[in-house]
Amino acid sequence: MKVLKPIRELIDRDRVFDVVNPSLRAPELDVSHGTVLYLEDISVSFDGFRALNNLTLYIGAGELRCIIGPNGAGKTTMMDVITGKTRPDTGSAFFGQTIDLLRLSEPDIAQAGIGRKFQSPTVFEQHTVFENLELAMAGPRGVWTMLFARLSAEQRDRIDSVLTLIGLQHLRLSLAGSLSHGQKQWLEIGMLLMQDPALLLVDEPVAGMTPQETERTAELLLSLAGERSVVVVEHDMAFVRSIARTVTVLHEGSVLAEGSMDQVQNNQRVMEVYLGEQL
């Protein structure tokens, strides 16, 4: 039966979005000291290769931070540690003052309020934009609830609010598979926003986008900062310059430099690492 494939797809996605499981209760986030993420002396090795080398990084509450660095600098491994995909050999990782990320599973970390957007968008192409957001909604709405229960007015308002924020209100009834690459990226960001994360990790959001989509993505990410913290890993330096107040440069698993884009560009050590590549 044709209906079975979409249902199976929804169930599989429900396993990915474990945060919709109402049996999980998120620990309370404490950012009273103004910092949402603490990474201290994090080291990770894979078969003798040190992907992270005593990495220390702090992200402020409401901050938009850009992370740059050459291939192999440790950017992906850093995000893997934050989201629980990789356990470090040494170091500590705290979400706010009290939530020890190294003691939590991946689903528990998502439930605590950390959302991650990978480079390639993952959406339900056979379902509408509205349905994609509905499935991702935080709270007691698993797959079967979505299939057989009606949304409340408050839930519809929440979806409409996110649709407006990501600029897809006019495509709410369109199949996700019909969207452009950039629109799919915005939809997946919207799906994460339905879970109301306090910290959003975004990996190369403008790769493959048109100039117009890139500009719109910059506007979207800037609009998200303040209410939540946003960490963007990106290779497009023009895009980084358009959104970043603070840039962190990673090299060989450690922080090489940190500051404004101008400060980073004029840093002698950074210029040596990039060997003349344009920043």
In which residue ranges do the predicted regions lie?
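ABC-family P-loop ATPase nucleotide-binding domain
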Residues: 1-43, 278-279
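Conserved ABC ATPase "signature" region
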Residues: 21, 27, 146-171, 198, ...
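The feature captures the beta-strand-to-loop junction immediately N-terminal to the Walker
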Residues: 68-70
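Helix-to-loop junction immediately C-terminal to a conserved catalytic motif
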Residues: 83
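ABC ATPase NBD Q-loop/coupling interface
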Residues: 92-111
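Catalytic Walker B motif of ABC-type/P-loop ATPase nucleotide-binding domains
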Residues: 200-204
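Helical segment within the ABC ATPase nucleotide-binding domain
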Residues: 214-226
